[in-house]
Amino acid sequence: MRKILTALLLFLSPLSFAQEKVSLADISLKTLDNQTVSLSQYQGKPLYIKMWASWCPICLAGLAEIDDLSGDKNLDFNVITIASPGQKNEQNSPKFINWYKGLDYKNITVLLDENGEIIKRANVLGYPFNLLLDKDLNLIKVQPGHLNSDQIKQFAKE
């Protein structure tokens, strides 16, 4: 019984957290080219964020699908990915950037949350982790685990 209750609490806590509408509009992140960008540049359209790590095999297996989805110009939401160098056992920024540049993805926007600000505000418990922000960049939905392209589209609609 205790195990079931613990599992239920772990599953439901991120969902209830998202109802607080935490704003992420003021967060600045780094690009792979060390440029600073603000999430506010994505205002005006819902924003889907895939939180992931280089050590996560499930995350890596889903990158090709995210690459395809990111290249779809007919979506009614934006798609980005965020890694957090130096957080949750992720390698540091220079190592992560060097590693990622060895991959062959053309469409994925990868931003770096070096201070773990999004991890803290969105209560990211593990990877992969999915976030949906409304057009004003308020956190409205979270979902742990892998989502394929069709599931992401459904996640962004609900």
Predicted features, each with a name:
Residues 4-13:
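Sec-dependent N-terminal signal peptides
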Residues 16-39:
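N-terminal "domain-start" segment that seeds a small globular fold
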Residues 45-47, 52-55, 126:
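Short pre-active-site segment immediately N-terminal to redox-active cysteine/selenocysteine motifs
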Residues 48-49, 79, 130:
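Hydrophobic beta-strand anchors of alpha/beta hydrolase catalytic cores
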Residues 51-65:
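Conserved redox-active cysteine motifs that mediate thiol-disulfide chemistry
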Residues 61-102, 114-120:
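Structural microenvironment flanking redox-active thiols in thiol-disulfide oxidoreductases
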Residues 102-106, 113-155:
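Thiol/disulfide oxidoreductase modules built on the thioredoxin-like
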